[in-house]
């Protein structure tokens, strides 16, 4: 018998589950496809979730009945109805009979980056800001679907901006540049039909991972002014989300304002990250910027272990309340 806990990062394009023994030793992990109920529907999301967990347990011969806690940070947890649906999936996994705590992935990241008080900017496949002040008030800004101009500053946003730039080149409005050559290689051929086919693929759920950001980064580092403009625009969008969160929480005058950075787009793009930092420190020079060294799945594992050892409420742990 190997008692263990599970920490899960259920994102929009990937699913990462990690198992740990009660002393914190990592027993196994598995990376699978998204289990978002928005993309798959509840029944398929439940099947894929069980499949992902089963693959993780197979790494170390774990059995469902030996699991003592599950903590999951999930995309698509955008309302009480979403929360009830996602929690229901985990509470009804065949063979598992342990306490479960599901939360929006940005709240999990917020705890990892700030310890429970401060503001988090998350820019990965999508984007959102989340904050909590010392009085316990919570605010989230952004995180809406792209069809209502949401996810500004995210990987999807950068993809759309890059393809828009490419479309203007096809129209004859833009000169050739390193970025356009990179995009042409991905699209396949410099034709309207190829661009329409590629954009249709990107717009059809389950949406593929945002994948043009690295090209935009490389082009910006080579001096492509349009690529730099796209990344600076994305940084400004993410700063706006954070600033609105700060203002809603009345944290403008906080002497020790902590702002965490999370997500592949902000973490991996030096050009966007540095512009975001510049904007943030220009407006709020008292800010301490936190860039966590652990990923969301490990953060979920750590919380699950603490929850098991201390008992009580996982909700309170995430908010640093006794």
Segments predicted by a language model, with ranges:
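Conserved phosphate-binding catalytic cores of ATP/NTP-utilizing and phosphoryl-transfer enzymes
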Residues: 1, 98-121
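ATP-binding/phosphotransfer module of carbohydrate and carboxylate kinases, centering on a glycine-rich
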Residues: 1-66, 113-118, 163-322
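A short glycine/serine-rich beta->alpha loop
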Residues: 37-38, 76, 143-152, 286-291
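Short beta-strand-loop/turn "lid" adjacent to the catalytic site in phosphate-handling enzymes
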Residues: 54-94, 101, 111-114, 258
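Glycine-rich beta-strand-to-loop/alpha-helix junction loops that act as flexible
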Residues: 71-77, 123-125, 257-267
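Acidic, glycine-rich active-site loops and adjacent beta-strand->loop/helix elements
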Residues: 74-78, 105-108, 126, 145
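Glycine/charged-rich beta-loop-alpha catalytic/anionic-binding loops adjacent to active sites
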Residues: 91-94, 137-146, 279-288
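Glycine-rich phosphate-binding loop of actin/hexokinase-like ATP-binding domains
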Residues: 116-173
């Amino acid at each position: 018998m190997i008692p263990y806990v599970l920490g899960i990062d259920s994102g929009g394009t990937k699913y990462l589950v990690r198992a740990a023994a009660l002393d914190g030793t990592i027993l196994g992990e598995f990376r699978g496809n998204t289990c978002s109920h928005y993309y798959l529907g509840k029944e398929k999301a439940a099947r894929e979730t069980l499949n992902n967990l089963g693959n993780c347990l197979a790494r170390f011969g774990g059995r469902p009945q030996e699991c003592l806690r599950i903590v999951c940070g999930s995309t698509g947890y955008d309302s009480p109805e979403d929360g009830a649906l996602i929690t229901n999936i985990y509470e009804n996994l065949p063979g598992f009979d342990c306490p479960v705590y599901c939360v929006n992935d940005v709240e999990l990241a917020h705890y990892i980056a700030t310890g429970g008080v401060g503001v988090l900017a998350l820019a990965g496949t999508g984007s959102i800001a989340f904050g909590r002040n010392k009085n316990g008030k919570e605010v989230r800004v952004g995180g809406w679907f792209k069809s209502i101009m949401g996810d500004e500053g995210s990987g999807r946003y950068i993809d759309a901006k890059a393809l828009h730039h490419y479309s203007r080149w096809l129209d004859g409005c833009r000169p050739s540049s390193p970025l356009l050559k990179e995009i042409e290689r991905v699209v396949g051929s410099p034709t309207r039909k190829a661009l329409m086919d590629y954009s249709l693929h990107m717009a059809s759920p389950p949406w593929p991972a945002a994948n043009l950001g690295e090209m935009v980064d490389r082009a910006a580092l080579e001096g492509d002014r349009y690529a730099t403009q796209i990344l600076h625009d994305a940084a400004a969008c993410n700063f706006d989300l954070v600033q609105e969160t700060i203002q809603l929480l009345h944290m403008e005058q906080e002497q020790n304002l902590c702002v965490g950075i999370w997500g592949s787009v902000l973490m991996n793009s030096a050009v966007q990250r540095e512009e975001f930092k510049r904007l943030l420190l220009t407006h709020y020079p008292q800010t301490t910027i936190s860039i966590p060294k652990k990923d969301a799945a490990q953060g979920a594992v750590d919380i699950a272990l603490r929850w098991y050892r201390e008992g009580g409420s996982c909700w309170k742990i995430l908010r640093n309340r006794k």
